[in-house]
Amino acid sequence: MADIKTGIFAKNVQKRLNRAQEKVLQKLGKADETKDEQFEEYVQNFKRQEAEGTRLQRELRGYLAAIKGMQEASMKLTESLHEVYEPDWYGREDVKMVGEKCDVLWEDFHQKLVDGSLLTLDTYLGQFPDIKNRIAKRSRKLVDYDSARHHLEALQSSKRKDESRISKAEEEFQKAQKVFEEFNVDLQEELPSLWSRRVGFYVNTFKNVSSLEAKFHKEIAVLCHKLYEVMTKLGDQHADKAFTIQGAPSDSGPLRIAKTPSPPEEPSPLPSPTASPNHTLAPASPAPARPRSPSQTRKGPPVPPLPKVTPTKELQQENIISFFEDNFVPEISVTTPSQNEVPEVKKEETLLDLDFDPFKPEVTPAGSAGVTHSPMSQTLPWDLWTTSTDLVQPASGGSFNGFTQPQDTSLFTMQTDQSMICNLAESEQAPPTEPKAEEPLAAVTPAVGLDLGMDTRAEEPVEEAVIIPGADADAAVGTLVSAAEGAPGEEAEAEKATVPAGEGVSLEEAKIGTETTEGAESAQPEAEELEATVPQEKVIPSVVIEPASNHEEEGENEITIGAEPKETTEDAAPPGPTSETPELATEQKPIQDPQPTPSAPAMGAADQLASAREASQELPPGFLYKVETLHDFEAANSDELTLQRGDVVLVVPSDSEADQDAGWLVGVKESDWLQYRDLATYKGLFPENFTRRLD
């Protein structure tokens, strides 16, 4: 018995060695290998079919486990409802019956799925292991077949032939071929059949699952409707004990808590070195959300970042500063910007700068009302200007043309005239005093002259005439007129010297100046009437301010300045020696206005009319107002404007009322209008809530 087992074991070992040797030779290419490509395709399909069936079995088992879990959960839910149900409530037994029937339905559904689908699937997959083993055995028999064939071929091709060995090798070859063909034929028939039967199996399985599930849901729906009717009747019996939850979802749809996302605040550094750190804002995201294009269904413009809280104009300066515990020192420029000074561009803005820039307070003396002005215009209307020399001088009217320009000398003329009017009134009632009140004005005047690039020495005689007190205004007028009559030659020489100096005074204007001097001689007997007309004639020309941008305009400004100091000097000059008076008159000649005094109001009105006409020509047709962009806006369509923060847009009437009602405006950027003057090409839509209006 032991010998038999030993022989079988040795035989198996010998087979394995032969197979290993044959595979090595085949891998090395020293022995050919029998291949069946069609059978290999069958094997690949079999492996795929087995993987699909295994996955289907796994998912079906998970589905059945979920059904079992639902059965237990439903049973526990009905049990809890039955426990809380009071005995006197309607439908107590019905609730218990519904729970029991639901449990029976779940159990029946689970069992039918197990019997009709899972067991069938297990049977379907049960045939794969046997076929898989037969495929592996066939591959081994194929190696034995190749080995026997190679051994027979080697004996037949050898020079020394042994018939006994050849005949034995032929028998082994025929035996290996027979065994291989048995496995091969069976698998060649079975594998394609198994691959084709998978379709019918899938159909039967899922038809069974779907029918069972439909039947289950139909039956359990009846029970759920029964429970719903019981609960409805119970609610009707206890209608006075209704319980409502605020914010609970209604039958109309799910509960939607609408919460508008608050856009991030704009980052800003500390307002000042002494400001506390708790005033800083958290870093923000770069830009607001992309707005919907107005060319599509415009339901409204995009929502910009949260607007900043800006104080109203009625707030006083001390109230604004007290909001930040007196740690904020407002940066207010109290000097007029000169022509050579270029304002620094702020790289960063603080929250306080953004909030309070439009309402920067102006330095005012005690007892006087605070006057504020917007930095967009930097000027006040002429009828609101104050004559106090302690106030900071407002910006010149040249800023009305849209560009920042230096202070014009007409401000000096205005305050000098008004101060001289006051001095004329005081000279008749009080003795002369020290001219200390005019010292601040004298300090401002050289700065103005430096800004305009003019010779301040031409204005010094006027200032001296202003601050020298006189006892009698009539005597001063007579002295100046007599001096003017005594020095006609010097006056002519002064006028000739003014013309070649390049100050913009023509010979025709010089002739007009001579007529003015003659008119002044005839006006000497009417000194009192002149005093009465001076206040009316001085204020209006001082409002007409021309921008000083080149030398020619500076010359014209000199003439405008001289129109008022001439009358002022005649009214306020003190009596003195005759030899000094002509010299003073001669020094004043280059800055005198060659035009007669009565024509000054007419000239001012004409200049105002020309300025208004020029301003109207610079605006597009149908101009409404200006706005400033607060946030960047990128155009989504061709009919929209791409705006950057700080851009100024000229708003014109909208072609579509729907866009305007939805919050969209139509306009053209001021820079494009000034450069191209083409409204049709460069106008476009932009959201109104991305901008603020400039008054």
Swiss-Prot record:
Residues 244-312, 486-617 are annotated as: Disordered. Its main location: membrane. The modification Phosphothreonine is found at residues 260, 280. Residues 622-695 form the SH3 domain. Residues 261-274 have a biased composition (Pro residues). SMART domains: BAR, SH3. GO terms for molecular function: phospholipid binding. The modification Phosphoserine is found at residues 252, 262, 268, 272, 276, 506, 638. InterPro entries: AH/BAR_dom_sf, Amphiphysin, Amphiphysin_1, Amphiphysin_I_SH3, BAR_dom, SH3-like_dom_sf, SH3_domain. GO terms for biological process: chemical synaptic transmission; endocytosis; synaptic vesicle endocytosis. Residues 24-240 form the BAR domain. Neurons, certain endocrine cell types and spermatocytes. It is a peripheral membrane protein. Residues 10-83, 144-191 form a coiled coil. It holds the Pfam family BAR. It is found in: Cytoplasmic vesicle, Secretory vesicle, Synaptic vesicle membrane; Cytoplasm, Cytoskeleton. One of its GO terms (cellular component) is cytosol. Keywords: Coiled coil, Cytoplasm, Cytoplasmic vesicle, Cytoskeleton, Membrane, Phosphoprotein, SH3 domain, Synapse. The keyword Phosphoprotein applies. CDD domains: BAR_Amphiphysin_I_II, SH3_Amphiphysin_I. Heterodimer with BIN1. Binds SH3GLB1. Interacts with REPS1 and SGIP1. Binds AP2A2. Interacts with AP2B1. Interacts with DNM1 and SYNJ1. May participate in mechanisms of regulated exocytosis in synapses and certain endocrine cell types. May control the properties of the membrane associated cytoskeleton. Antibodies against AMPH are detected in patients with stiff-man syndrome, a rare disease of the central nervous system characterized by progressive rigidity of the body musculature with superimposed painful spasms. This is Amphiphysin. It comes from Homo sapiens (Human). The lineage of its organism: Eukaryota, Metazoa, Chordata, Craniata, Vertebrata.
